[in-house]
Amino acid sequence: MSSTKELQEEANDFLTIGFQMKKRFLVTLLLLSVIGLSQAADTAPAKQDPIWLTQARASIKAEKYDQAVQQLQAANETSSADWNNLLGYSLRKKQPPDLVGAEKYYQAALKIEPSHRGALEYYGKLKLINNDLPGAEALLARLDKACTFGCEEYSDLKEAVQKYKSKK
């Protein structure tokens, strides 16, 4: 049989554990409420990409560049930097490529959004195709500023510039 003292110690242990669990629960609730409140009241819900963007990206991923060009031209979202960038990319990658058209759309994307990372990278690669190393390096410098802590687009264009230089 347990003594009264042992029973009292077990009861105290039980109460201590119960208190610790309640404390953890309350701290968790408090943290969750703070996280919930940290979102601004005016934050709009995340927008879903327009159908033309989803379709064009799928065509590009499947390397169906002519199809992507048709989808993008049908959407005719000329005021969108993404639209101009993807159309430029598709024109550059299709066979045969339309490099003049691609440049026009990259320039339009950058006029709308001067720090559009995709357009800066792809336009830089187009500059290399056209043997314009200074132009590619200027776009690389702009991309460096747009990517404060580094980004894939900067790394990709930097690698393309280095490969270009090693071939010359």
Question: How should each PLM-predicted stretch be described?
Answer:
Residues 86-87, 122, 156-160:
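Canonical tetratricopeptide repeat
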Residues 62-67, 95-108, 130-139:
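Structural signature of tandem alpha-helical TPR/SEL1-like repeats
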